[in-house]
């Protein structure tokens, strides 16, 4: 830190007429925050703490400064510097940080709980909360922990490794989750381990969180964990559509987290992630409707060639506005196995909504069945819903002809999914099992017994 600060003093104190102007403080803070995020993702907590603290010091007084200092405290704690973490955390709350529940339940700060200053820090954050302009996003309650995909790691093992307790508040920590994933991969010979957390913003599950540890045993990699090669190019953004979609999604997410997005807000196409009913969002959809049909090829190029996964995901969402449903499907189908989770999620979301709205099959059953075996819960839940809609649209004789092969290929996976606690993973699996079996069972034990009675080979 001293070395960096000294360089800054020299540069500013030279007084030369040709010296560069000091960087804009807001831009400098943003750059430092981006560097801190990179360090955080790399589990480089020393650099993460230093960069977030520098971002806070570069920023003006206000919530962004307090948030940067709060993040610096988490990284310092993870780096093993408890005293330094306390010092910077005090500065965060003195600067107005007010998300007291997040602070209290943040696992990155667990090492500070036994220190004398902890209770005072929490109390000051709660005092700040009383003066906050609006309440923070509430900390959810953990409702379930699932383990999926490994023959060697069960639900209780995952719960113990993660140190989670159902019924307690949970704060997401990407760094701690990655550490636990690495531990499981090394200890149980997994080629893939990914922890995901699903939050519910509405319905009877509002305020609930579910954690899923998705895994692939090393011997299953060829079937379940192969993807397209990562793109390396930089495709043109046609008429700024990618940027506009990202602007829409950013604002829509803000409104959703603030509880300001109407649940019945709709779209004029099959796929809809938040609608356009709010005044802040109303201008976006007419633009997408007018421009996307002219740029289907260019958006498909982004999806195929651009190295930026965020741009590829946006292109997938925009292709829902292609002139016909079949064009949407044909553009997206080749990218079901994109190497990035978020892109696959976007592709499968649009395919699922498009098939749901259709009256005839738009994809081959084998393509969708392969997608059900993908490694993450985001992959599987959408692929399995997609399969339910596809089977609904198959003629009865076609469904009957494929029944045995589908049971052979997917039966075990679907039965395992029927035992999960996360409803959006369990429910579509039960739906497909009912379609394939003609039975109306509900529990995983009933489906296990049913599967045991089926022939062991197709045909």
List where the protein language model places each region.
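Start-of-helix register in tetratricopeptide repeats
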Residues: 30, 64-67
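TPR/TPR-like alpha-solenoid helical repeat scaffolds
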Residues: 66-71, 99-125, 429-434
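Extended repeat-based scaffolds of very large eukaryotic assembly and lipid-transport proteins
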Residues: 126, 216-326, 337, 341-345, ...
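Periplasmic polypeptide-binding modules associated with outer-membrane biogenesis and secretion
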Residues: 126-151, 160, 164-230
